[in-house]
Amino acid sequence: MIDSSHVNRGQRPDYLGKEAFVFMNDSLQYYNQHAKEFSDSTRDVEFKEMQERFLVYLKPGARILDFGCGSGRDTKYFLDRGFETDAADGSEELVRIASGYTGIEVRLMYFQDLDEKEAYDGIWACSSILHLAYRELEDVFIKMARALTSHGILYTSFKYGTAEGERNGRYFTDMTEEKMDKLLKDVNSFDILEMWVTSDVRPGRAEEKWLNMILRKK
């Protein structure tokens, strides 16, 4: 079980630089202020193709961490499919909404606070860790690898591109295949099983592209 009892929203953790803390808090503040709107716009989006593309690599009943669960859409899908599922998010309001929607206790935590060891067969980080600065990602990928069991599976996705910075109240690190390849070489913990580009599935946003990947722990 993920322990979030130490989280203090008003205090910068020792491991976070001042600039990174500001970036993260700005994004979390956005989600706290727009939690209902965000949940309503994402909860009913048809995402079965992606979910099943991840689940095919897992055994029935495997243990999954929904890492940055947002509205709880994917957590509920995994639970309904019979998978043991934990969920975590950094936004207090989204944690409240997702807990009510999924019926489980969603944990409040920063991505950087993941400290589980070989606890999960799969980690689902869908459109979540993209809010970290690029320089924060290597450490978080290493922590995700540590949290996975032997040859565990990670799905994650990023907006497609090379930009990094604040957009409309949130911080984004965009990714291309080349940028991700470099990051994964530095991390040296995962093999790439699949990497592909898709269009946004939300109405009116098909022009937005996403880089998706399924990785296996070495």
Predicted regions located by residue number:
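Conserved class I S-adenosyl-L-methionine
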Residues: 19-59, 61-70
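A short glycine-rich, Lys/Arg-flanked "PGG" loop and its adjoining helix->strand segment in the class I
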Residues: 138-150
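Class I SAM-dependent methyltransferase SAM/SAH-binding core
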Residues: 71-113
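A short acidic, Gly/Pro-enriched loop at the edge of an enzyme's catalytic core
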Residues: 112-123
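Acceptor-substrate binding/catalytic loop of class I
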Residues: 163-179, 202-204
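Conserved beta-strand signature within the Rossmann-like core of class I S-adenosyl-L-methionine
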Residues: 151-158
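Conserved S-adenosyl-L-methionine
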Residues: 189-200
